[in-house]
Curated annotation (Swiss-Prot):
Gene responsible for this protein: SLC39A4
Associated disorder: Defects in SLC39A4 are the cause of bovine hereditary zinc-deficiency (BHZD); also known as lethal trait A46, Adema disease, hereditary parakeratosis, and hereditary thymus hypoplasia. BHZD is a autosomal recessive disease caused by the inability to absorb sufficient zinc. The symptoms are diarrhea, immune system dysfunction, skin lesions and death if untreated. Oral zinc supplementation allows symptom free development of calves.
UniProt-recorded name of the protein: Zinc transporter ZIP4
Reactions mediated catalytically: Zn(2+)(in) = Zn(2+)(out)
Site positions per UniProt: Essential role in Zn(2+) sensing: 517
Protein species of origin: Bos taurus
Protein topology in the membrane: Multi-pass membrane protein
Residue positions the entry lists as glycosylated: 223, 267
Pfam families to which the protein is assigned, alphabetical: EF-hand_Zip, Zip, ZIP4_domain
Subunit details: Homodimer; homodimerization is mediated by the transmembrane domain.
């Protein structure tokens, strides 16, 4: 041990011991001492030996996992805030905890960790693991599962005679340097044992379950007394009232007719497995039983203490889910959801804002087109880049991470959509127009009175927003009378039954649509505030052109400005109903997934079936300006949702 005090010899001897693979277990004093004392460092030679040991320890089911870790990758763990800086020559003691967490990730999931290393996120994932293990309640359970994954990936299985390291030993070694329950020292102890070639036992021994039951009573008697047995049976819901025995004195609690003596709470420091919920496969593995042979009567007598311990500890009882950093409390969900929905509903008043400006008829047309393209980008981007990964479970934070690869694949879907959009738009711009196509209007539009179509209401001429002489009583006939000579006829305008029905069809369709939007916003805020923000942004972007178009369509149907605004606002308020239904129902994670899946389908339908055709069919005297606005809106919407999808884990207040 004196040689370890000399500079450079300690790491070198550790490397030689790892390469020798003698199979003997040595106490990992090197890493723990380095971490606790803050003296010394790991140089390139030591790190190279450690990485070779890690690569030799793992085994994948489909063959060798291969080597993906380099010394430079390990040295980069010391400067995660400067990924482009040149590598140093040593790893300082203050980075041992991150190195240990990063090594544990590699041992438990080598393929996934290699993907993180290539993406430059190895240090970030190691820090996330350390934060996850900070909770003392989650430390034992998470470390047990981590040891199970490491044991499953181990290249060789330990023999029955081999003494292996278990979780209590790791916790004890961390406590020995004055850091009980601290994840950094525990993982450093784990890495030290890996370096020395030790094996691991992830599950407790059979004797643990018997010891747990006897630890439940507080008396000094090594045996369970009658009173304690009665308390134990009552806790299990077994047996009837205990009759006092003749030999009992009147001072006995049972003799006085009092209830059984309550059991003492389990000592949390007695064992690291007290809160571990074991599966049937785990229990059979503890007792060395074959899954194919099953449990014999003799085996049942052996494993009964394990079942009793699981019942007494309550380890498998449903635990209240604690909100994560991204999740909101119930009051915050209602507050932020209501504010977001209110902003969305205010879109219904934008028509009045445009009508107040008599010179904005041409400008309003380009504003609508810009919002239209931004809505397509926001809707498709939110559906494909944000909602679909959540629905498919690709945005998980339970240790199994898929990296950015699915995001790039989904971005390629949007790339294909954009490529064909460019092809069609350039094809229409470069080819000569049909002489019958209108050239002097801002846009061509047709009308369908048999039903509600957003494509109809979104393709509007600038004259659709001309201000009437009397704002409080103006109608669509007043707005376009100066351009429609037939409306100047002394005969009153006769509206067809279909045109008279159109306002109610539009209002009903918008009410259902806004109700679905409210459901989507509510489910998004149930998931996290980031998902709520992204969904609210997408809904807002597509509601602006929708509400403007619907307002103009209502005016075209002959309604007054006041009545058109009233119907527009009334249909928008159904979004609050959908929001509160989603929040009050308190759907679980599965329910949120289904609602978000339906919301993704709704967004794709509205974007690709309603709004994109409106963009493709619009005609204008300045087509290249429209082409520029459409591209800016599309790319802007996709960029915002892409950045949110990639970096939402790094957003915090």
């Amino acid at each position: 041990m004196a040689l370890l005090g000399r500079p450079g010899l300690g790491p070198l001897l550790a490397v030689l011991a790892a390469l020798a693979a003698s199979g003997t277990t040595t106490r990992p004093v090197h890493l723990l001492t380095l971490l606790s004392s803050g003296q010394g460092a790991l140089d390139r030679v030591a790190l190279g030996g450690l990485l070779n040991t890690l690569a030799a320890r793992v085994h994948c089911a489909d063959g060798p996992c291969g080597k993906c870790l380099s010394v430079d990758d390990a040295l980069a763990l010391g400067r995660p805030e400067q990924p482009g800086a040149p590598s140093g020559q040593v790893l300082e003691p203050r980075h041992i905890a991150r190195l240990s967490a990063a090594a544990a990730l590699y041992l438990s999931d080598p393929a996934g960790t290699c993907a993180e290393v290539r993406a430059g996120r190895w240090a970030a994932r190691a820090d996330q693991l350390l934060v996850l293990l900070e909770s003392s309640q989650a430390l034992s359970v998470a470390l047990t599962r981590l040891l199970q994954q490491i044991q499953a990936r181990a290249a060789g299985q330990p023999t029955s005679q081999q003494a292996c390291v278990d979780l209590p030993q790791l916790l004890g070694e961390a406590a020995g340097i004055g850091a009980p329950g601290s994840p950094g020292p525990v993982l450093a102890a784990l890495l030290g044992h890996v370096w020395s070639g030790a094996c691991f036992h992830a599950l407790p021994t059979p004797q643990y379950f018997v010891d747990f039951v006897f630890r439940q009573h507080s008396s000094e008697n090594p045996n369970i007394t009658l009173d304690e047995l009665a308390a134990l049976m009552e806790r299990l819901g077994l047996g009837g009232a205990t009759e006092p025995h003749d030999s009992h004195s009147d001072d006995s609690p049972l003799g006085k007719g009092q209830g059984p003596v309550p059991l003492a709470a389990p000592n949390s420091s007695a064992s690291a497995w007290d809160t571990l919920c074991l599966s049937a496969q785990d229990i059979m593995a503890v007792y060395g039983m074959s899954e194919q042979a099953g449990v014999t009567p003799d085996d049942w007598a052996r494993l009964s203490p394990a079942l009793l311990q699981q019942q007494l500890s309550g380890a498998c009882s449903p635990q209240p889910t604690l909100p994560t950093q991204d999740q909101l409390s119930q009051a915050e969900r209602y507050l932020y959801g209501s504010l977001a929905t209110l902003l969305i509903c205010l879109c219904s008043l934008l028509g009045l804002l445009l009508l107040s400006c008599a010179s904005c008829s041409t400008t309003s047309h380009y504003i609508i087109q810009a919002f239209l393209s931004m809505a397509v980008g926001a809707l498709t981007g939110d559906a494909l880049l944000h909602l679909m990964p959540k629905v498919l479970g690709l945005h998980t934070h339970d240790g199994e991470d898929h990296g950015f690869q699915p995001t790039w694949h989904l971005l390629a879907v949007l790339g294909g959509l954009y490529a064909f959009f460019l092809f069609e738009r350039l094809f229409n711009l470069l080819l000569p127009l049909d002489p019958e196509d209108p050239k002097d209007g801002a846009c061509s539009h047709g009308h369908s009175h048999g039903g509600h179509s957003h494509g109809v209401s979104l393709q509007l001429a600038p004259s659709d927003f001309r201000q009437p002489k009397q704002l409080h009583e103006g109608s669509r006939a007043d707005l376009v009378a100066e351009e429609s000579p037939e409306l100047l006829s002394p005969e009153p305008r006769r509206r067809s039954p279909g045109l008279r029905l159109l306002p109610y069809v539009i209002t009903l369709g918008d009410a259902v649509h806004n109700f679905a939007d409210g459901l989507a916003v509510g489910a998004a805020f149930l998931s996290s505030w980031k998902t709520g923000l992204a969904t609210s942004l997408a809904v807002f972007c597509h509601e602006v052109p929708h509400e403007l178009g619907d307002f103009a369509a209502l005016l075209h149907a002959g309604l007054s400005v006041r009545r058109a605004l009233l119907l527009n606002v009334a249909s928008a308020l159904t979004a609050f109903i959908g929001l509160y239904v989603a929040l009050a129902a308190g759907v679980g994670e599965d329910g949120e997934t289904w609602i978000l899946a339906v919301a993704a389908g709704l967004f794709l339908y509205v974007a690709l079936c309603d709004m994109l055709p409106a963009m493709l069919n619009v005609r204008d005297r300045r087509p290249w300006l429209l082409f520029l606005l459409h591209n800016v809106g599309l790319l802007g919407g996709w960029t915002v949702l892409l950045l949110l999808s990639l970096y939402e884990d790094n957003i915090a207040f």
